[in-house]
Amino acid sequence: MQDAIVSGGSEAGIIKSGIGGFNAVQALSKRNDDPKTASRPFDLDRDGFVLGEGGGCVILEELDHAISRGAKIYAEVVGIGLSSDAYHMTAPHPDGEGAISVMNNCIRDSGLTYKDVDVVNMHGTSTPLGDKAEAKALGAVFKDHLYSMNINSTKSMTGPVSYTHLRCRRWTLCR
C-alpha cells in the first residue's frame, strides 16, 4: 500500500458537441442573461445548468504518515460509497435509488449513523428530474435529520466540469 497518492484531472468541454449534446437533452439553463442566477440546484425555478470547465487534484495520505511528517490535515476519510444508477441514459431513477444506495453504502462503510452527517455536497444539476430524485433520496436516507443539515452543490458555482468532478468529489464521509 502507498503512503500517499495524487489524483487529478481537467476538463475543457465547452465545445460544439458538448453544448449540442446537453442542449439536445434540455439540460442547459436558459437564464444566460444573468449568470449569477442561472444554475440553481434544488430551487423551485431551476431550469438546467451552465456548462463549466476546470480541473482539480486531491492528495490522499495515510493518517499516520501525514501525522509523522507534520502535515496539515484538512479531513479524514472515514467511509466511501459506490453505486451506479443505470435507470436511464440522461435521467436518474425517479425515486433516487442510485443516490440512496451510494449514501447508505458510505454511511455503512464509515461505521457512523446518518445522524452523524452534518454537510452533504450533492450532484445538484439544477434539472427538474435530477434535483427531484436527489431530494427524494436525501429524505429517504436522512429522514427528519435532513432539516438540521447543510446541503449544497458545487455545480451552482462552477457548472458541471464533466468527469473532473468525479475525481474531486466522491461520496465520502470525512471528519
Task: Name what the model sees in each region.
Residues 1, 25-50, 137-163:
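Conserved catalytic cysteine-centered active-site region
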Residues 6-10, 72-80, 115-122, 149-155:
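Beta-strand segments within the central parallel beta-sheet cores of soluble alpha/beta enzyme folds
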Residues 10-14, 26, 55, 63-65, ...:
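Glycine-rich beta-alpha junction loops
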Residues 35-110, 118-119:
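Condensing-enzyme catalytic core mediating Claisen C-C bond formation in acyl metabolism
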Residues 87-96, 125-142, 161-163:
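Short glycine/threonine-rich loop-to-helix capping motif typified by GTGT followed
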Residues 164-169:
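Conserved small/polar residues in nucleotide/adenosyl-binding loops
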